[in-house]
């Protein structure tokens, strides 16, 4: 067993979503980076958008930590490896500190990382202290560093908030309410980093605001135990995988792409919006993103639509997740009612909704093996296709996402986390496999019968069927 490693670390959490966790985490990352420190940032739970912002802020890749989807050992490995190179580790929580199972608090407690509570101080005075006390004392064994007030109006306002804290609660400072440092959002969350031309200006402004009003010394070092290291097998040696990546398709986990490379795959990125043909590839990966914002442009690229149809007709592997699946349908209609005809490999149509349609962790038993991931979308899909499998939410949700298969094409609303089962992922992308697996029926029963141990942790809202 390798020795443990030590690195200053803190987990940034809040009483609820929308309190400004990402803004504060990004500001801290940019501040310490500007001071010459190497900062590694992680995000609790499934998320694609926050990590884009945090990568720009820190200048380093951002990975997920999660006790169920990622797993304890993989989370331990990521932290242990980061501790070898970083001067500071920041972990942004998800939802409220104690929300969900697993929660941000579960992760902080398990790895001994102290929590910095971020509380939106808007229209609040003494109640701030009550909220801070609740965060600190609700679970007595939770390491708690202190609190930081966000969106504070004036210096006097900040003094009122600080004065409301009970003895023993540490005040880290206050971040003012400035539009120049807030991060804009849309229906799936924050606007993608690549779409914000002034993002670096916002991050530097937030870092400067923190430096002038908050305590920014490094937190105490945390001991991170060494994991059990398992080397990836070269199951995809020499396999060329074309990966869609542009403003319509950008929702990929860094750990998933790392795994494909570690198994020997060669990744070739392309744009379904701008490119007219696919790269020379054995397999195709269409991840999620915002196809609904670009569906007209996607529909107008007839050459790319034909290239994807030809890839499938040649019997080559194709994996499509969420937005990637919508792209493969006959049509996609946005919230304004504008309809665009797309690839047409999956018979059906999707319509965007103004409200959230599904949010949940998912465990899926495919013919290739069990995979874990999550679902999060604002569309509803109508199709007569028969699924080969349905996901199960680990907390026993009232619905589950379907997985569809036509030949070597696999499509679902589920965003799969590839390291949850490298062998199954390799089978999805490897060319030349027997196609008999495509016709296997969906398994029945609960997570135990599907080979996925019933976790003591689950998460999220129940998913709705497509």
Language model region names:
Residues 239-313:
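Phosphate-binding active sites in nucleotide-utilizing proteins
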Residues 2-111, 119-142, 155-159:
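ATP-dependent carboxylate-amine ligase catalytic core
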Residues 125-233:
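Internal gly/pro-rich beta-alpha loop/helix module
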Residues 441-442, 463:
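Short, low-complexity intrinsically disordered segments enriched in A/P/G/S/L with frequent Arg
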Residues 182-230, 234-238, 349-434:
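Amide-donor transfer/coupling interface in amidating biosynthetic enzymes
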Residues 113, 169, 313-317:
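A short helix->loop->beta-strand "cap" motif at the edges of active sites that frequently abuts
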């Amino acid at each position: 067993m390798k020795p443990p490693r030590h690195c200053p670390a803190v987990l940034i959490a809040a009483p609820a979503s929308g309190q400004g966790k990402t803004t504060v985490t990004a500001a801290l990352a940019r501040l310490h980076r500007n001071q010459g420190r190497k900062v590694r940032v992680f995000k609790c739970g499934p998320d694609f958008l926050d990590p884009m912002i945090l990568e720009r802020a820190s200048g380093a890749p951002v990975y997920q930590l999660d006790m169920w989807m990622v797993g304890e050992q993989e989370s331990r490995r990521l932290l242990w490896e980061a501790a070898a190179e970083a001067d500071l580790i920041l972990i942004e929580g998800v939802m409220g500190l104690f929300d969900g199972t697993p929660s941000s608090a579960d992760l902080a407690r398990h790895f001994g990382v102290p929590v910095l509570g971020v509380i939106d101080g808007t229209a609040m005075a003494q109640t701030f202290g009550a909220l801070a006390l609740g965060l600190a004392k609700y679970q007595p064994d939770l390491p708690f560093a202190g609190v930081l007030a966000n969106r504070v109006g004036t210096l006097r306002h900040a003094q009122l908030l600080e004065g409301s804290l009970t003895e023993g609660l540490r005040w880290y400072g206050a971040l003012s309410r400035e539009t120049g440092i807030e991060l804009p959002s849309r229906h799936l969350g924050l606007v993608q980093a690549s779409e914000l031309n002034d993002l670096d200006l916002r991050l530097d402004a937030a870092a400067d605001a923190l430096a002038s009003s908050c305590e920014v010394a490094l937190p105490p070092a945390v001991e991170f135990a060494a994991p059990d290291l398992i080397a990836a097998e070269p199951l995809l040696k020499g396999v060329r995988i074309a990966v869609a990546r542009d403003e319509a398709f950008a929702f990929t986990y860094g750990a998933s792409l790392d795994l494909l490379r570690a198994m020997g795959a060669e990744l070739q990125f392309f744009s379904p919006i701008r490119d007219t043909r696919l790269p020379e590839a054995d397999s195709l990966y269409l991840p999620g993103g915002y196809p609904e914002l670009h569906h007209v442009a996607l529909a107008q690229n007839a050459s790319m639509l034909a290239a994807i149809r030809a890839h499938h007709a040649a019997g080559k592997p194709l994996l499509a997740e969420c937005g990637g699946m919508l792209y493969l349908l006959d049509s996609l209609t946005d919230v304004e009612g504008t309809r665009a005809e797309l690839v047409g490999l999956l018979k059906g149509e999707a319509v965007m909704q103004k409200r959230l349609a599904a949010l949940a962790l998912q465990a899926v038993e495919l013919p290739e093996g069990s995979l874990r991931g999550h679902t999060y979308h604002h569309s509803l899909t109508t199709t007569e296709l028969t699924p080969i499998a349905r996901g199960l939410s680990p907390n026993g949700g009232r619905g589950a996402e379907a997985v569809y298969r036509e030949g070597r094409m696999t499509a679902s609303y589920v965003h799969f986390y590839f390291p949850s089962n490298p062998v199954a992922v390799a089978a999805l992308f490897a060319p030349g496999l027997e196609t008999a697996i495509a016709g296997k029926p969906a398994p029945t029963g609960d997570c135990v019968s599907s080979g996925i141990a019933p976790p003591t942790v689950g998460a999220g809202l129940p998913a709705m069927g497509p």
